[in-house]
């Protein structure tokens, strides 16, 4: 992905992260201590919880952020659950 901001659905975000990474979805699922198909199955769903998205994004090396639309300032980083 380039540095351009993308407006996409959460499942598209997961698919893009998976495609951009050298790590496989199976690698990330196992790193999280979950079923080997967890990440792939999650990316196929239309109802991914924010906590799940934050957890998978963090495992791929990304932060999930809330950005102020008026200022384009990153206001909050959503931490995955501990």
Residue ranges, per PLM feature:
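Short, charged recognition helix plus adjacent turn
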Residues: 67-82
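Key DNA-contacting residues within the recognition helix of helix-turn-helix
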Residues: 15, 40-41, 54
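Short alpha-helical "recognition helix" segments of helix-turn-helix
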Residues: 24-29
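Alpha-helical residues within the helix-turn-helix
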Residues: 19, 30, 58
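A short, Lys/Arg-rich alpha-helix, primarily the initiator
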Residues: 1-21
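DNA major-groove recognition helix of helix-turn-helix/homeodomain DNA-binding modules
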Residues: 51-67
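Recognition helix of helix-turn-helix/homeodomain-like DNA-binding domains
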Residues: 33-48
């Amino acid at each position: 992905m380039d540095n351009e901001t993308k407006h996409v659905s959460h499942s598209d975000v997961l698919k893009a992260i998976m495609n951009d990474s050298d790590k496989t979805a199976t690698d990330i699922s196992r790193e999280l201590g979950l079923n080997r198909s967890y990440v792939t199955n999650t990316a196929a769903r239309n109802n991914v919880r924010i906590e799940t998205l934050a957890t998978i994004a963090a495992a791929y090396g990304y932060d999930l952020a809330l950005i102020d639309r008026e200022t384009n300032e990153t206001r909050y980083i959503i931490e995955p659950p501990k």
